[in-house]
Amino acid sequence: DVPPMRLSNLLRDQVRGRLAVARRAGGHETDAKLCVFYSKYAENSIHHLNGSPIDDYIPAFEKIIGRGYQIMLTGDSGRRDDLVQRFKGMVVNEEALSISRDLFNMYAATEADIFVGDNGGGAFLSSINTKHQLVMNSYPFLSSVPNAWIFHMWAHYEDGRPVPYDELATTYASYDPGHNIHVEPNDMDDILAAVEFFLDEIDAPSEGIGGSKLVLEWPTVSLFRMSN
């Protein structure tokens, strides 16, 4: 087996110790598992790959923390000091740990027990070591990452009708600005439901989910098929 990509023992011990200090400062004396959260959301952006607003993840954060995880904020969420203050040591960014952003991001991506967040570079980096990933707002529809639960963006025609699954897997599998569809990120309720399902699956894996035959509709050259 190929050994996991990790920081040096010295750097890992440094960050691990500061995570523990942050928990204790917030009144949390017990150890915690680690969740890396990645956001790809830019305020007022109309880009088709923009993720969900970070505030839409807050109920999910509460659920994740309730399951014993400390959350490391990466991506566009990293500057949200208000979330660090709100969750008292169970949500941290690089400023809270007084370390560089590069060190923070590399530790989070390579040491976390789980990943939760938007599709994008942060998800791909975390896939190197993380066994369980929940990737929200995946688009284009052919994209995927290994070992992940994938929740795609919502897609509908210009008249508001939802795009059928078989068309997402074929006609609209790749991004084309000429497509006559609109895509929208998952909302707060979608995210919370996805996180609850994800955490339950980690604790007690099911034998399978209905609709698995539909996966065969996806192009064989797609990342979605190759990662399953």
What are these regions (language model features)?
Residues 80, 87-94, 123-125, 131, ...:
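Polyanion-binding and phosphate-handling cores
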Residues 1-24, 148-228:
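Leloir-type glycosyltransferase catalytic cores
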Residues 1-6, 29-36, 140-143, 147-148:
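Conserved nucleotide-diphosphate donor binding/catalytic pocket of glycan-assembly enzymes
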Residues 104-153:
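A donor-sugar binding/catalytic signature common to diverse glycosyltransferases
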Residues 52-60, 109, 191-193:
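Well-ordered, non-membrane alpha-helical segments in soluble/globular domains
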Residues 32-43, 54-101, 211-223:
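Catalytic donor nucleotide-activated moiety binding site of glycosyltransferases and closely related
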